[in-house]
Amino acid sequence: MNEKSYPRIGETVLEKTLPNGLKIFIVPKPQHRKKYAFFATRYGGMDIQFIRNGEKCDTPAGIAHYLEHKMFDTKDGNALQVLSQNGAEPNAFTSNAMTGYYFDCTEHFEENLRILLSFVSVPYFTDAVSYTHLRA
């Protein structure tokens, strides 16, 4: 891990890039009980047009915000509820250029982090639910 110190503000940031390109940043805060995790992706409200198989593909306005909510669905239920039951305070937001998922907690951080990484890495979409919501 690369370490960068910011002495003016008394912070150190550890950074590592995984083989898949995912960048991880850790800001150690040993004096704090509460821990915080944030996962961001470069996909936001302005991302409505793509090239798929060489052809332009338009998606509906609001699709990023819709997907932000759908990402919490898992085959076993809703990740928001699981995180909350596990003592975390989860949330998410969509801006023009990104979508972020995060939580904070004082206990069970590693388990909550696994849950977060699982639902953002393995989306659970069903044809019926997706089609119904997109038509609304």
Regions flagged by a language model, labelled:
Residues 123-131:
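Short secondary-structure capping/junction motifs at helix and strand boundaries
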Residues 27, 32-50, 62, 78-122:
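M16 family metallopeptidases and their MPP-like homologs
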Residues 1-79:
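His/Glu-rich zincin catalytic helix
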Residues 132-136:
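Conserved small/polar residues in nucleotide/adenosyl-binding loops
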